C-alpha cells in the first residue's frame, strides 16, 4: 500500500469523524425543512482541498452523521452536499492556483471568492431540489404548504442556504 493512500484514508477518516460528531454536539437552528448546524460544512470544505475521492468520502460520512440525528429530509439535504463537494474538489484539483495571490497562498482574493460564490449557488440549488421533491410528493408538515412553495423552497432553502456557505 502506498504511503499517500494511507494518508488520504486517515485524513478522510478524521474528517468523517468530525462530520459525524458535529450534528450531534453543535448548536442547531431548526426551521424544518431547514436545519442550520454550526460548523457542519467545515469537514467537507477541508476535504475539497485534498482530492475528489476524499470529498466524496467525507460527504457520505457526514450524511451518515445527519441520518443519526435529524429527520430524513435534513439528512438528504446533507447527501446533496456530494454534488458541490465533488465539483469543488475537482475544480480545486485542476486549478490549484485559485487560492494563490501573487504566488502566495491566501483565501483573500477575488478568484477564490468567486469560486466560493459558485459553490454556494450549486449548494443551494441541490438543497432546493431535495426540498422541492419532498414538497411535491406531500411529505412535509402542513404549515409549509400554507406558507407556500416560494417561501419554503426559495427563501428558506435558497437564499438562506446560499448564505450558509
What are these regions (language model features)?
Residues 1-165:
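Loop-helix junctions at membrane interfaces
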Amino acid at each position: 500500500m502506498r504511503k499517500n493512500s494511507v494518508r488520504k484514508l486517515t485524513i478522510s477518516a478524521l474528517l468523517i469523524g468530525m462530520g459525524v460528531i458535529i450534528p450531534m454536539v453543535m448548536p442547531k437552528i431548526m426551521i424544518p425543512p431547514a436545519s442550520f448546524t454550526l460548523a457542519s460544512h467545515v469537514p467537507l470544505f477541508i476535504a475539497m482541498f485534498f482530492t475528489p475521492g476524499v470529498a466524496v468520502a467525507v460527504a457520505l460520512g457526514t450524511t451518515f452523521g445527519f441520518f443519526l440525528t435529524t429527520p430524513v429530509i435534513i439528512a438528504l439535504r446533507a447527501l446533496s452536499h456530494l454534488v458541490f463537494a465533488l465539483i469543488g474538489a475537482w475544480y480545486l484539483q485542476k486549478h490549484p492556483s485559485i487560492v494563490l495571490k501573487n504566488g502566495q497562498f491566501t483565501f483573500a482574493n477575488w478568484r477564490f471568492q468567486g469560486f466560493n460564490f459558485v459553490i454556494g449557488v450549486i449548494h443551494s440549488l441541490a438543497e432546493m431540489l431535495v426540498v422541492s421533491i419532498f414538497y411535491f410528493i406531500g411529505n412535509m408538515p402542513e404549515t409549509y404548504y400554507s406558507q407556500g412553495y416560494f417561501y419554503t423552497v426559495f427563501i428558506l432553502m435558497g437564499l438562506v442556504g446560499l448564505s450558509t456557505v
